[in-house]
Amino acid sequence: MHDVSPALYTAEIVHWIALVVMAVVYTLRIRWLLSFKLAADKSAPGNPAQSDKKRGARHSLFNVAMPWSMESTRSRKGFGFYLSFVIFHLGVVAGIALAFVSTIAPDVLRVPAVGWTTMTLIVGAFLVSLYRIARRTLRPLMRLISTPDDYFSLFMLTGWFALGAATQAYLMGIWGMTSETLLVAYLYLTSFFLLYVPFSKISHYLYYPFTRIYIGRALGHRGSYPFSRA
């Protein structure tokens, strides 16, 4: 255990309570999703030599980690957007890790290799989020399809990344960041996200495995996925 001030102790307790609430909501939602019976495809197998349900589902599920198999990444611009996607989500993972590790073993985040890796990922995600704000607000098509939740989530995540970078700097004792208030504020903001995310569009990742497996099974059964290039 590590010595903490009353303010930080309270923030840590709130943080873990928020995690429990999020876990309960997600458990109920996953249970609800699993209550639906998967519809059977009554059509005959399309091309068993090419693919089947299992292969299609497996390829569809892990497609996000295979940019070479995506139509959208064949151009330089498309691959650049994919890289920004990877950086953004790695930053989210680093930010979540920062919040939880700081409450359990903050000294780990002071190890130079760990600290600078965390800092790099969070700062990278912050820069990508600024690009996403510009893209969403300046492009007419993006404005047309954006909802208040999209803007709110993006602006809040951008602030979260900025505060996360400052918090990591505080833990490492760099950039003149010396106030524990940074860590307290970061834990409270993370707690807010843990409570908000299950009810926002950010929770799309919860549905990802279900939708990808379903579409992969359907197209794999018909022998059209994974597709083969001529």
Predicted regions, residues:
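Long, highly hydrophobic alpha-helical transmembrane signal-anchor segments
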Residues: 1-29, 154-171, 175-178
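Membrane-helix boundary/juxtamembrane motif in polytopic membrane proteins
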Residues: 138-160
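Cytosolic juxtamembrane amphipathic/interface segments immediately preceding
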Residues: 2-8, 67-81
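Hydrophobic alpha-helical membrane-embedded segments
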Residues: 14-47, 196-198
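Transmembrane alpha-helix entry/boundary detector in multi-pass membrane proteins
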Residues: 78-85, 104-122, 146
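Terminal transmembrane helical module of multi-pass membrane proteins
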Residues: 156-230
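Membrane-interface amphipathic/juxtamembrane segments adjacent to transmembrane helices
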Residues: 30-72
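Hydrophobic alpha-helical transmembrane segments of multi-pass integral membrane proteins
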Residues: 18-25, 79-102, 122-132, 153-166, ...
